[in-house]
């Protein structure tokens, strides 16, 4: 066992797929015998946009759109030799961004 700390950040627009991916990562890491903490839900980033419906006049008539970016954090406190192999062999669904820092 090494004392290398690995931090995994997951980002996505759909929180259900994000939670499934986090669970898949946690299960794969527990099979290797690594000590983990998480997944920790981080604050959701909400971007709001207002667009004028009409192309010419009527500024009073606007449409609002928003994009919600959900985030999860997983820390691997103690790794084993199989941990990195398990992380590289994972097949995560489309729509989930993963960022791994050593």
UniProtKB/Swiss-Prot annotation:
User: What's an example Gene Ontology biological process for this entry?
Assistant: translation
Kindly give the InterPro entries that the UniProt entry links to this protein.
Answer: Ribosomal_uS10 (IPR001848), Ribosomal_uS10_dom (IPR027486), Ribosomal_uS10_dom_sf (IPR036838)
Q: Which Gene3D superfamilies match?
A: Ribosomal protein S10 domain (3.30.70.600)
Q: Can you state the subunit structure given in the record?
A: Part of the 30S ribosomal subunit.
Q: Does the keyword Phosphoprotein apply?
A: no
Its function, per the record, reads: Involved in the binding of tRNA to the ribosomes.
| Protein's recorded name | Small ribosomal subunit protein uS10
**Classification via Pfam families:** Ribosomal_S10
What is the scientific name of the source organism? Dehalococcoides mccartyi (strain ATCC BAA-2266 / KCTC 15142 / 195) (Dehalococcoides ethenogenes (strain 195))
Molecular function per GO: structural constituent of ribosome; tRNA binding
GO CC entries = ribonucleoprotein complex; ribosome
What keywords does the record list, in alphabetical order?
Ribonucleoprotein, Ribosomal protein
- Family, similarity comment: Belongs to the universal ribosomal protein uS10 family.
């Amino acid at each position: 066992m090494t004392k290398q700390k690995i931090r995994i950040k997951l980002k996505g627009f759909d929180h259900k797929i994000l939670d499934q991916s986090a669970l898949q990562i946690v299960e794969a890491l527990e099979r290797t015998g690594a000590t983990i903490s998480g997944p920790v839900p981080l604050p959701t980033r909400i971007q709001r946009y207002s667009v004028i419906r009409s192309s010419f006049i009527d500024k009073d008539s606007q449409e609002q759109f928003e994009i919600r970016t959900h985030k999860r954090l997983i820390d691997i406190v103690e790794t084993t030799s199989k941990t990195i192999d398990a992380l590289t062999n994972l097949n995560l669904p489309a729509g989930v961004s993963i960022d791994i820092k050593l």
